[in-house]
Amino acid sequence: MTRTRLLASTASAVPVRSVPTVGQLLAAPVAAVPAGTLVKVLGYHTAGDGGGMTVRWDPRATAPGNCGTVLDPGSAVGRWLQLHDGVGDFRRFGLFGTAEAADDALDAMVNDPAIRRIEAHTDLRFARRHTYFRSELELDFGGHTVVTKGIERNTHDNPFGAVLYFRGNRAETSATVTLAAPLAELSDVFEVPDSAAFGVGTWWAVESDVVPGGGRYERELQKLLQVTEIVDATHVRFNYQNGWAFAAGRKLTYTKVEPVTQVHVRNMVFIGADAGVKDPYVDGSGAPDEFEYTGSHPIAFEYAVRCDVSGIHATGTWWPVIMRRWCTHFRTTQCSLKNPPTVFYGGAGYLTQQIYCLYGHIADCLSSNARHLNDLTASAHCLVENCHGDGDDTGGNPFTTHGQYEHDLTFVGNSGLLDIANSGSLWGTSAKRITIRKHRMSWFVALTKITDLTLEDVHVTARSTFDPGGTFQVNADGLQLRGCTGVTLNIGRRSGRSSRPNLVSDCSFAAPPGTTIGQTPIDVPLTFRRCTFSGADGWVFNSSGPVHFEDCIVRGTAGAPITFKNSDVVITGGRWTDVGLQLTAVRDQRLHVGGGALFKGTNQAKALLSRQGGPGTVTWELNSYTSVASAGDTAHLLIDAGGNRFRCTGATFDGGRIAFAAAAFADSSYALHSRNVETAVTRDVPAGSDRLSVGDNLTF
């Protein structure tokens, strides 16, 4: 590594000479030039072209010339050394466009520790893929274009084969500890083999073993962490509060890392080597294997801390424009990607990917016709805001997480398709505490093992070019939806880690006929509060856990009733119009209706409240509600099968009929229908008995 001299701020007695160009400087004889002679070069190729510099003669220097910071006049000994204030400039290497590759100049400046900032003032071309271990450096391309046509071939499956790849050093040896005691969630004190090896301020790659019985890559912890305190001989504190609990006997592996730090890349327009080439994977002309070798992308970081990227605008890149793995504390802002060669090849066509990353902020980014705008894999405590992906109906979803135990991720003010933890069981399909606010899209899928999912002001709008159903799929494990809208709502249950209630409030949905809203595995309470449902026709709740509707508006099409298999169905307040509520009696069930609820209209079953002939006993608890039938043949209550324990008091019925079959109140069944108000109601009920009391009502 060659270290150039910084221009001294103190006055010098050495006279400063002047020459028009670098060529004239190098053509001048140097045999009699005194040591320390300063020369002001007015331009690189022509005076005033921006490539001018001040150089100093060092008669003892033997460093190889690099056409910029070290100028070789052709002598065995003696070099002109560029003086600078820590800022490097490609023009001072004679580069003013894309005619010549800028790779050698880039290497010279990055590998010079005296240079802390590198600037581009023209378009540039790079023909090689560069790997650096370098910190405290800023590269600013000034909004100019970088091209890479004909760049050297990449290696197989290598998203780190970027033009700029900054990588920290990872030790070759690791230390593993078997936990003697459980490691609780939110712990920042970790058990280690010997804390004497862990100095305060050192960085470590920390990995858990594979989840017992889990998938091949299923690990809850893979992060780059810094030691903040030595607690005792076998414990240290890290700068991270653990997102997942570990039982005693689980293993943690620690590998020391010397990260690259404070490297920032800014303001570049990047044209991928295969930009504009048709994707053979899509059109059937062949597999896209060749593209991973010939394609190009600008930036990759690995084992990096506080390395930021901003103002990168790429077209036609193969691997992610900004690729990160094992990164902690970073920002990616005001970047974009247009038209990558593929959206169907896994790992390709991304704007930014983060693997094993922590404390990241991705903001003000755009993607067009890409696979992903942002992918968070095995990452935590990251914020994605004001990012927008268009062209997402062609095969890519702008926002995704892998499902490799991500936790505490927040998305705010974004738009574009979004799915969570959806990459497959090999990685665990698990995530925790994902919060999404103010998001617009035409498809949302979060139906895997996602715990404590929070959605606020999220809107799924059906779009004929991608998902006409406007799908909204979520997991009932601490689920909280507030102020959301969608079309097809599907709620499942793939995990049961949370103690938080499942609540959908102030939301609106309009599912197609026959939609299964509550799936079979849901065995916990599910509450809908102040929600609006439109187009109800044959909807199904197959779940077994209780379901509550509080002050909800349900509008039907006078089609098939909504069927429920839930153990408890509780209706408090609200309005149900042209829709029937029918219990399947597949198990013992309880229906509670009250709180001023209103049922009104008719439906295909000609019954507003009814049951099927399943083997379960249905307990009916009806009070303080109103039922208005719009046709004389529509029943407010139709109970004609199975075992029933019926109680209705304080209700109001208008028009229609009430139909009870004697067989539905045999054996241990009973009915108490009393102190109600009935107006123009036709009764079809058996005579009263010691188990059937239908008197003491006010009838008109």
Model-predicted regions and their roles:
Residues 14-34, 91-121, 125, 193-201:
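Acidic Gly/Asp/Thr-rich repetitive segments characteristic of extracellular carbohydrate-active
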Residues 15-33, 40-43, 48, 147-233, ...:
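Autoprocessing Asn-cyclization modules and mimics
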Residues 37-42, 92, 105-129, 137-148, ...:
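Glycine-rich repeat segments that build the extracellular carbohydrate-interaction surface of secreted
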Residues 59-66, 116-117, 128-151, 229-231, ...:
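Beta-solenoid repeat scaffold
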Residues 128-130, 148-152, 274-280, 317-323, ...:
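Short glycine/acidic-rich loop motifs that flank beta-strands on beta-rich extracellular proteins
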Residues 138-142, 263-265, 307-311, 329-335, ...:
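All-beta strand scaffolds that present successive hydrophobic residues in beta-strands
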Residues 150-174, 238, 243-246, 266-296, ...:
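Acidic/polar low-complexity surface segments
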Residues 202, 207-231, 266-373, 379:
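Right-handed parallel beta-helix
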